Amino acid sequence: MNVDKQRQEAQPAFVLHSYPYLETSLIVEVFTQNSGRIAVVAKGAKRPTSPLRGLLRAFQPLLLSWGGKSELRTLHKAEWQGGQLPLQGTALICGFYLNELLIRLLHRNDPHERLFACYQEALSDLSTASDYIPILRRFEQRLLQEMGYALTLDHDVSSGKPIKPTQMYCYEIERGPIASSNGSCPFNLELSGKTLLDMYQGDYLAPLTRLQSRILMRHLLSHYLGDKPLHTRQLLKEFQQL
């Protein structure tokens, strides 16, 4: 459901990306709590005396006010809320990865309040965690769920039977897991039942679960992203297999 494009006041938001516009302004992609992903023009934001200068940064909770009827709204005010620790090193790249997923997969002006809360929680977790894999996998799953493509992880979609930890399953994109009988599986998406159940419970401690869940999510996301690869995924590969 699209939201009203008229004036919005003090709406919680995060900057996803920004780029220069004309000589002194910025176009900013933001993820908002009640309006979803929108684009705003921050007029004069690059001027040394602008109150917006240095404020429109990624991963910092903001309160934004804007107006306008076009696809590109005009930012009127931004306030820093605080409370979010800065992301550094691999955590910073993970944050940019989440931002790129939101930009690429969410339609503008569609509210996703639960996903906004999940994103905020993921940023908080990234700032303190030493293991980033569970954070990324959970967010990826929630994102697909919000898009209407929730993963089936607890039962065989062909037979309806509960997943067995010792059984191997072939995961069919846009359907779900089916018990594997001959070992052949499209895109090599064969997973153990334990991996599926671990993902269902959000448990990514087992090495095989970490490996197979990464392969599964990479294929699922690529299916919805299309041919254009994610820039941040290559950066993550250079650091570690996330």
UniProtKB/Swiss-Prot annotation:
Bilayer-crossing regions: none
InterPro entries in alphabetical order: ARFGAP/RecO, DNA_rep/recomb_RecO_N, NA-bd_OB-fold, RecO, RecO_C
GO cellular component, one term: bacterial nucleoid
One Pfam short name: RecO_C
Keywords (A to Z) from UniProt: DNA damage, DNA recombination, DNA repair
Gene3D superfamilies with a match to the protein in the record: Nucleic acid-binding proteins (2.40.50.140), Recombination protein O, C-terminal domain (1.20.1440.120)
Tree of life domain: Bacteria
Gene Ontology biological process terms, A to Z: DNA recombination; double-strand break repair
Record-linked HAMAP family: RecO
Record's function text: Involved in DNA repair and RecF pathway recombination.
Family in the record: Belongs to the RecO family.
Protein name: DNA repair protein RecO
Lineage of source species: Bacteria, Pseudomonadati, Pseudomonadota, Betaproteobacteria, Nitrosomonadales
Gene of this entry: recO
